[in-house]
Amino acid sequence: MIDMLVLRIPFKSSLVSERLDSKGNYVSHVNLAEVARLSGLTLAAHTVEYAIDGDLTVSGLKHPYESLPSHYAGIALKIFEGGKNFEPCVELKASPAKLLQGHNVFGPTSFELCGLEFFGAFAAAMPELYDLCDVTNTVVGRIDVTFSAKVANDHIANQVISFLRNVSNGQTKKTRALDYETTVMWNEGSRHRTLVAYLKHHEVQAQIKRLQKKKSSHLTIYEKNCLEVLSNPDLQLYAVGLVRFEARLHTRFFENFGLPRKFFDIVKYQDNYESGSFNLICDLWKKSFKDLFDAFKGSDMNVYDDSKVYDALINNFSSVTKSGNISNSKANRLFGFYRRLVNEGYDNVAQTMERTTFWRSLKELTSVGLSKAQLMNLSTDNNVVPLVQMINVDFSQQYPEWYVEPVSIFNRSNVVSINAA
């Protein structure tokens, strides 16, 4: 799936000033004030000065990020005025999957389809600014390609993320400062590629909660449409147990792979790709994750499915705080005790834990249906699984049976002739 796309659309040459600086570097820029006058765009000023006679002087003009509306999500738009070795452009940034279908649990792999949605939304929302742009020379600044491994449930998926926190290989280094409970990242800040693994079901649930917390009157139209899509129980069920592997690819990676920089050249490249258009996205992903997945070979991890135990503890030991929030702290503490019994054995835990705390915790565990005999014989000996078997990214199983590829609402001939570009 193409999970994120950043397009940089240059301005028409008549609006761009070009020169070489004293060191021979190419410098180009566009007059933001003139662009604003022609397009009706609103700019921000770094400095505003008032003279005694009332004259107003504005300097340091810039264009802040703004959002273009679409049916399901916004497109981030920003104008860059240019500089040394950087052409002035309009940058568009969004998840094509969210634009086209309201979610990115799975989604399209066609650059042509994704680009049509970007250009169509841009032309519809800001036709005057669109007319100032040289659309056919659009370049790609970043592509996120994403595929998922499916495990039995979210409990096991959490174990996979925990294991991945200790994995790195070759030029793929873990970014420790950006670890979260359900996310692990490698190579943050790289100009080549950044890799991320995270739990999709957790992200979907967090997005739903975030939208539901807003008053209905404060939701935008596209947020309401998005919430309706995310509330689909089939979609939520499909997201359970999905471990998402996302590669955020930058221009240096494009060069190493042999991918063109210009967007319409990429469209043609994909159309003519030897093994098929879908496989271009697969091959980009495989190349980006090769070092990491090589590190998986020969690695084993303990896999335990204790989701029923955890659910029973949540049901019996959750409480409501004074502020009205639900607290799972006691259930989590008891589950941690249960996991110690699994990993260290009953006798070892009994000998190393404070006696009163041990017996109280044991009594509370047995109150949810576990017998003392069971707790004395927990073992992980039969749960060792090769990591490459656990993390199986099957490219033929990336969509549910009911998936239908979305279609752009925009007419290609009214936006830009992709085939003729």
From Swiss-Prot:
Annotated S-S bridges: none
InterPro entries: G2P, G2P_C, G2P_N
Entries under Pfam families matching the protein: G2P_X_C, Phage_CRI
Molecular functions per Gene Ontology: DNA binding; DNA ligase (ATP) activity; endonuclease activity
Keywords, comma-separated and alphabetical: DNA replication, DNA-binding, Endonuclease, Hydrolase, Ligase, Nuclease
Domain of life: Viruses
BP-aspect Gene Ontology terms: DNA replication
The EC number(s) this enzyme carries: 3.1.21.-, 6.5.1.1
UniProt entry tagged with the keyword Ribosomal protein: no
Family indicated by similarity: Belongs to the inovirus G2P protein family.
Function: Isoform G2P plays an essential role in viral DNA replication. Binds the origin of replication and cleaves the dsDNA replicative form I (RFI) and becomes covalently bound to it via phosphotyrosine bond, generating the dsDNA replicative form II (RFII). In turn, viral DNA replication initiates at the 3'-OH of the cleavage site. After one round of rolling circle synthesis, protein G2P is linked to the newly synthesized ssDNA and joins the ends of the displaced strand to generate a circular single-stranded molecule ready to be packed into a virion. Isoform G10P protein binds to double-stranded DNA and prevents hydrolysis by nucleases. Additionally, G10P is an inhibitor of DNA replication and may have a role in the transition from semiconservative replicative form DNA replication to single-stranded DNA synthesis in the life cycle.
Protein name: Replication-associated protein G2P
Lineage: Viruses, Monodnaviria, Loebvirae, Hofneiviricota, Faserviricetes
